[in-house]
Swiss-Prot record:
Organism for this UniProt entry: Neisseria meningitidis serogroup C (strain 053442)
Entry note: cofactor: Binds 1 [4Fe-4S] cluster per subunit.
Catalytic activity: iminosuccinate + dihydroxyacetone phosphate = quinolinate + phosphate + 2 H2O + H(+)
BP GO terms, sorted: 'de novo' NAD biosynthetic process from L-aspartate
Keywords: 4Fe-4S, Cytoplasm, Iron, Iron-sulfur, Metal-binding, Pyridine nucleotide biosynthesis, Transferase
Entry binding sites for [4Fe-4S] cluster: 128, 215, 312
The family this protein is said to belong to: Belongs to the quinolinate synthase family. Type 1 subfamily.
Keyword Phosphoprotein: no
Single Gene Ontology MF annotation: 4 iron, 4 sulfur cluster binding
Official protein name in the record: Quinolinate synthase
C-alpha cells in the first residue's frame, strides 16, 4: 500500500440533466497524496527508474498530473501529453507495460488500444467528472431514442460508453471530425461535455444533441471575472480550453486542447498569458517559455468559492508512491472484458486513423484539405 499521507476531498456531483431524464450521480471523492519532501522524491524517482527498466515499462503522463511525475516521464523516455498524444504514444511504444499517470479513462483507452500490454495506474480510483456524469446505461437509452444519429463521444468516457459510440474524439481533433461528419450530412449525438459540444456546434453548425455533462475544473471558470482580469492585463493573450462555459470561450484569443494552448504559449511573441485550464499545464509552459508570465484565470465569482480551483482532484491522486506501488506489486492493473475492449476499439481507432490522415494532409476536415 501507499505510505504517503492522504488528504480527502469530497464532491457532491450535481444532478446531471439529460435531454430525456435526470440521472443522479453518486457522490464523488478524491484522496490526494501529500507532496513528498525532496529527499523522498529523489529516492522514489531513482527506484521507479530502475523498476521501469526491470519491468520493460514506460511512463505515460498527462499534462495535469504532478510536475514530479511529468519530469520523470520525460527523463525515462516516456510521454507527457494530452489524451490523444498519450493514446498514440502508448499504442506505438514497444514497452510491454504502460504506466498511465492520469485518470481512469486514460488507462482504459490504453488497454483498449493495446490489449496485449499490461496497463498499470498509480491509483485506479482516479476518476473524471465527465466519465462519472455519463453512465453507460442512461447514455445508451438516450442514444436508442435517436437511432438515426451518429454517436460521437469525448475520450473522457468509460470503455462501455465508447463501445456504444460510432466515433471517439479528443479536443485536439473534435472540430475536424465533427466538420467532416457534417459535410457527410450526418446528424449527431454528442456526449458528455455540454460546453465542448456547444462550442463545436457553434463553430461547425452541425446538428447535435448534447448530453449535459461537465468538467469539474473547467465548469468553474467565470466569464465576468475573466473579462475583469483581462481588462487589468490588456496585453495578455487569453488561452481557453473548450470545456469551459461559453462566456469564457468567447473571451479566448486561443481556444483549444492542452497541446494547442501549450504550443500557443511557446510560439506566440507575447510575454503574458491568462490560462483558463487546469493549472497543471503551467509546469510545461514555464519550462518551455521561462521568460513569459502565466496568470491563472478566475474560478469563482466575487465572494464565491471554488471546488476544484483549477486543479483536478483526481489527477492529483497520481503520486510517485503510487507508481512505485503499481510496478512492485503488479496491482492497479486495468482489466477489460475482451468483447467490450474490441467494441470500444473501433471508434477509438477510427479517431486515431483520422488524426493520422490529418497529419498527412489526405483527410477532408469539412473546410478543405487539411
Amino acid at each position: 500500500m501507499q505510505t504517503a499521507a492522504r488528504r480527502s476531498f469530497d464532491y457532491d456531483m450535481p444532478l446531471i440533466q439529460t435531454p430525456t431524464s435526470a440521472c443522479q450521480i453518486r457522490q464523488a471523492w478524491a484522496k490526494v497524496a501529500d507532496t513528498p519532501d525532496r529527499e523522498t522524491a529523489d529516492r522514489l524517482k531513482d527506484e521507479i527508474k530502475a523498476l521501469l527498466k526491470e519491468k520493460n515499462a514506460v511512463l505515460v503522463a498527462h499534462y495535469y498530473v504532478d510536475p514530479l511525475i511529468q519530469d520523470l516521464a520525460l527523463e525515462t523516455g516516456g510521454c507527457v501529453g494530452d489524451s490523444l498524444e498519450m493514446a498514440r504514444f502508448g499504442a506505438e511504444h514497444e514497452a510491454g507495460t504502460l504506466v498511465v499517470a492520469g485518470v481512469r479513462f486514460m488507462g482504459e483507452s490504453a488497454k483498449i488500444l493495446c490489449p496485449e500490454k499490461t496497463v498499470l495506474m498509480p491509483d485506479l480510483e482516479a476518476e473524471c467528472s465527465l466519465d462519472l456524469g455519463c453512465p453507460e446505461e442512461a447514455f445508451s437509452a438516450f442514444c436508442d431514442q435517436h437511432p438515426d444519429r451518429t454517436v460521437v463521444v469525448y475520450a473522457n468516457t468509460s470503455a462501455a460508453v465508447k463501445a456504444r459510440a460510432d466515433w471517439v474524439v479528443t479536443s485536439s481533433v473534435a472540430l475536424e471530425i465533427v466538420s467532416y461528419l457534417k459535410s457527410r450530412g450526418e446528424k449527431l449525438i454528442w456526449g458528455p461535455d455540454r460546453h465542448l459540444g456547444d462550442y463545436i456546434r457553434r463553430e461547425t453548425g452541425a446538428d447535435m444533441l448534447l448530453w449535459q455533462g461537465s468538467c469539474i475544473v473547467h465548469n468553474e471558470f467565470k466569464g465576468q471575472e475573466l473579462a475583469a482580469l483581462k481588462a487589468e492585463h490588456p496585453d495578455a493573450v487569453v488561452l481557453v480550453h473548450p470545456e469551459s462555459p461559453q462566456s469564457v470561450i468567447e473571451l479566448g484569443d486561443v481556444v483549444g486542447s492542452t497541446s494547442k494552448l501549450l504550443k500557443a504559449a511557446v510560439s506566440r511573441p507575447e510575454k503574458k498569458f491568462i490560462v483558463a485550464t487546469d493549472l497543471g499545464i503551467l509546469h510545461e509552459m514555464q519550462k518551455q517559455a521561462p521568460d513569459k508570465e502565466f496568470i491563472a484565470a478566475p474560478t469563482a465569482g466575487n465572494g464565491g468559492s471554488c471546488k476544484s480551483c483549477a486543479f483536478c482532484p483526481w489527477m492529483a491522486m497520481n503520486s510517485l508512491g503510487g507508481i512505485k506501488y503499481a510496478l512492485t506489486s503488479g496491482r492497479n492493473e486495468i482489466l477489460l472484458d475482451r468483447k467490450l475492449g474490441e467494441a470500444a476499439k473501433l471508434p477509438l481507432q477510427r479517431m486515431l486513423d483520422f488524426a493520422a490522415g490529418l497529419k498527412r494532409g489526405d483527410v477532408f476536415n469539412g473546410m478543405g484539405p487539411a
